[in-house]
Amino acid sequence: MKPSVVLYKSLPEDLRARLDEHCHVTEINGLTAENIAKHEDVFRQAEGILGSGGKVDAEFLRQAPKLRVASSISVGYDNFDVAALNDRGVLLMHTPTVLTETVADTMMALVLSSARRVVEMAERVKSGEWRGSISSDWFGIDVHHKKLGILGMGRIGLALAQRAHLGFGMPILYNARKHHDEAEQRFDAEYCDLDTLLAESDFLCISLPLTEQTHHLIGREQLAKMKRSAILINAGRGPVVDEQALIAALKDGTLHAAGLDVFEQEPLPVSSELLALRNVVALPHIGSATHETRYGMAKDAVDNLIAALNGKVEKNCVNPR
C-alpha cells in the first residue's frame, strides 16, 4: 500500500506524476493552520509531507501522529522544530546542493548592483532624470580588487568566493566555525575573527543559517565596526541582521549601502523604512529563484521523500538517525 503524503506546494507535472507513482497524495494550498484544521483526517494518516514554508513544530506533530518524513523544498529549515522532530523520530530532508551556484549568482548581483547603484540609476532613467552628462552624484564605487568578507563559508560562500576572487580579483576574508581548506587553497581566502572581518571588509556578505546563535549576530555594535564605505549583503536569513540597527546605520552614514534578499519579516511590509532608502537594493527572497534551480530543488525534494519513506536515507537529511 502506498504511503499517504500531504503536498503543500504545487509541483511540475512530471514530478507530481513521479510522486503519485510512489505515494497516495493529497495536495493543499500551503501549510496554514486553516488548511491543517480543514484536512484534519488527512494529516492524521500522513506518513510524509512535502513543500516549503509553514511551521512544523510539536503542535503540528500532534496532529500528524503517523508522520515519518518531512521533505522541504529549501536549504534552510528554521521553520522546523528539529528537536520536536527528533523526539518523534521524524526525518527532515532538505535540498542543500542544487541551489548553491544560483544563490551565489544572486549574492554577486547584489554586490554589483549595490556598488554601482544599478537599480537606482535605472529608475532615474525611467523617470526622465537623465537629460545630459551625468554628475558625480550618479557615481557608484568600484568592485574589482576590493576586499570581500564572507560570514559563513559553506557551499554558497565558497561559490561566492570563486566568483569574486577569480572574476573580480577580490581578496577574500572569511569567518566561520572552522577553517575552510578549499577556500584558502583555491582562492587565497584568509580566515579572521569577526571583528577583523567587520573592520576590513569592503563588502560583507552574509551566508548563515538562522539559529539561536546567529539571531541578530550583526547589530548596532557590529555595524559600527565596519568601514563607512562598506556595503552589507545578506542573502542568508533576515533575522541574522538587526534590521532596525541596519536602517539606522544606512541613514546616518555608518554604512554606505546594503543589498538584501532576506528580511526579518517576509514579505517585507510596504511601510518598511528600508524601501525609502536610496542606498538599499531590496529583492523578494529570490536567491534560488530561477526556473532551472527551482525545478531541481523540487526534484530533489521528491526524490528525498520517496527515498526516506523507503528507508534509503543516503543524503540531504538534517537529522539522520
Curated annotation (Swiss-Prot):
Role, per record: Catalyzes the NADPH-dependent reduction of glyoxylate and hydroxypyruvate into glycolate and glycerate, respectively.
Coiled-coil regions listed in the entry: none
Similarity remark: Belongs to the D-isomer specific 2-hydroxyacid dehydrogenase family. GhrB subfamily.
Source species, domain of life: Bacteria
Cellular component per GO, a single term: cytosol
Compartments, as annotated in UniProt: Cytoplasm
E.C. number(s) listed in UniProt: 1.1.1.79, 1.1.1.81
Catalysed reactions, as listed in the record: glycolate + NADP(+) = glyoxylate + NADPH + H(+); (R)-glycerate + NAD(+) = 3-hydroxypyruvate + NADH + H(+); (R)-glycerate + NADP(+) = 3-hydroxypyruvate + NADPH + H(+)
Naturally occurring in which organism (per UniProt): Erwinia tasmaniensis (strain DSM 17950 / CFBP 7177 / CIP 109463 / NCPPB 4357 / Et1/99)
Keywords assigned by UniProt, alphabetized: Cytoplasm, NAD, NADP, Oxidoreductase
Enzyme class name: oxidoreductase
Catalytic center residues: 237, 266, 285
Record text on subunit structure and interactions: Homodimer.
The keyword NAD appears for this protein: yes
Annotated protein name in UniProt: Glyoxylate/hydroxypyruvate reductase B
Example GO molecular function: NAD binding
Gene: ghrB
Pfam families, per database record: 2-Hacid_dh, 2-Hacid_dh_C
InterPro entries named in the record: D-isomer_2-hydroxyacid_DH, D-isomer_2_OHA_DH_cat_dom, D-isomer_DH_CS, D-isomer_DH_NAD-bd, Glyo/OHPyrv_Rdtase_B, NAD(P)-bd_dom_sf
